[in-house]
A protein has these predicted regions:
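Structural motif
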Residues: 29-43
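Hydrophobic beta-strand segments
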Residues: 46-50, 77, 115
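Short, acidic Ser/Thr/Gly-rich low-complexity loop/linker segments typical of extracellular
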Residues: 54-64
């Protein structure tokens, strides 16, 4: 398998996980929905955090969120996302169970578009050189919420979740050789219909937290000496967390033997720190896409990848930039040879950092670590209880997912890894 397959680990037969931090008896929750103030539509992936702490989460695809607090003190809650003016609201003002958070678009002035145009390759080269200045030089332990879902057509056929720890070595070396992931607890819920059984297994799962951290892992997108292998273009800048961002689109101009990516990268104009990337696997070579992600399939089954996309975002805290959120969507078709029709599947995973310990002496041993070739779905049990994550921060499930869970629970038993 090519280089991409080593780093885009994702496990299919696949399904959902979540992480958080344990809270004291005085814990309380703030919750609500984040919407665009102009069109009233829900805003997804809004970063929501407690000021002065490393605690946070993101809004779900409907804009809904919940954030657990370790005590009842009045702490400011921050809301930020690309293209919108950030907000800071006292937690006491969010005592209602049905809070509506309205965020305004933050337009970029024409003068800013003109002034901050420049050579995209030079900007990227400088940003790569400044990684040791802009990212943690400590050994950090991230607490993360992780979730996987899989749909057959429009119908959910499985979901799995886990609380995970992610050990990160310093960013001055762009290598993930010693970064590791450990599953603390997890659960899964699957359809009991035999026709929904999917024997395809795709590499990855919780190791996305290590493998697609493109700032730390030079093998995901490009290293400095590979910049000439890509075409770059300056796009219209955007604001994120009140800071102007360069937006640079890229696509490969030199084709390799492994799957490659095209997409957009966001770079903080002042710090020249990478803050976000949206990228997809080049769709013109299905063989390379398959080699990058397929771990195992039954004989006679045809696997046809349609789309493989990633979003990776980072958050600026006290002058340093930290990994914050990762999502991966994979669309593919499967059928047995000599069958007339194929089935369409969508596998989706996402994870968010909910807490962080900096400069820690804690380690994850190789024995405890989630291995590159392990399949997450295979190592967590079935269990589904409403209070399972009562003392953890998670990404709230969407309404469609909640309905799917209710239907799946009616079809059979569920298990848990305690």
């Amino acid at each position: 398998m090519g280089r991409t397959s080593k780093y885009i680990a994702f496990a299919l037969c696949l399904l959902m996980t979540s992480m958080g931090f344990t809270l004291s008896a005085q814990a309380r929750t703030v919750s609500g929905r984040v919407i665009d103030s102009r069109n009233q539509k829900g805003l997804s992936n809004v970063s929501i955090s407690l000021k002065g702490t490393n605690v946070g989460t993101v809004s779900n695809a409907d804009g809904n969120f919940s954030l657990y607090m370790a005590d009842s003190n009045n702490i400011a809650v921050s809301f930020s996302t690309v293209g919108y003016t950030s907000l800071s609201i006292s937690s006491d003002s969010l005592a209602s169970a049905n809070n509506i958070i309205r965020m305004d678009r933050q337009p970029v002035e024409l003068s800013e578009v003109v002034i901050y145009g420049g050579d995209p390759m030079k900007i990227l080269s400088t940003a790569l050189k400044k990684i040791p200045d802009n990212y943690s030089l400590n050994r950090d332990m991230l607490s993360m919420f992780y979730r996987e879902t899989i749909r057959k057509g429009k119908r959910f056929i499985g979901v799995s979740e886990a609380a995970i720890d992610v050990y990160k070595t310093p960013y001055d070396r762009r290598s993930v050789d010693f970064d590791r992931v450990q599953i603390d607890r997890g659960r899964r819920l699957v359809s009991q219909k035999s026709s929904d059984t999917l024997a395809v297994k795709i590499v990855g799962g919780p190791n996305l937290a290590v493998n697609v951290d493109f700032v730390k892992n030079a093998d995901v997108l490009f290293s400095e000496h590979e910049l000439t292998d890509f075409d770059f273009k300056m796009e219209k800048p955007e604001y994120a967390d009140e800071r102007l961002q360069y937006v640079i689109s890229f696509r490969p101009k030199v084709r390799r033997e492994y799957a490659q990516f095209r997409g957009k990268i966001y770079i903080d104009r002042e710090l020249l720190a990478f803050t976000r990337a949206e990228f997809e696997m080049m769709p013109d070579d299905k063989g390379k896409m398959t080699a990058a992600v397929l771990h195992k399939k039954p004989r006679g089954l045809r696997f046809d990848p349609q789309k493989i996309e990633f979003v990776v975002s980072y958050k600026l805290v006290d002058g340093k930039t930290y990994l914050n959120y990762i999502s991966n969507e994979m669309k593919f078709k499967c059928d047995m040879k000599r069958r007339l029709f194929s089935s369409a599947y969508t596998a989706y995973s996402e994870m968010v950092v909910v807490d962080r310990k900096e400069n820690t002496d804690e380690r994850i041993s190789y024995k405890e670590a989630f291995k590159p070739r392990q399949i997450f779905y295979d190592i967590v049990d079935e269990y589904w209880d409403e209070d399972y994550w009562s003392e953890y921060n998670i990404i709230e499930p969407t309404e469609s997912l909640e309905n799917a869970v209710w239907k799946l629970k009616k079809t059979g038993k569920t298990l848990s890894m305690q």
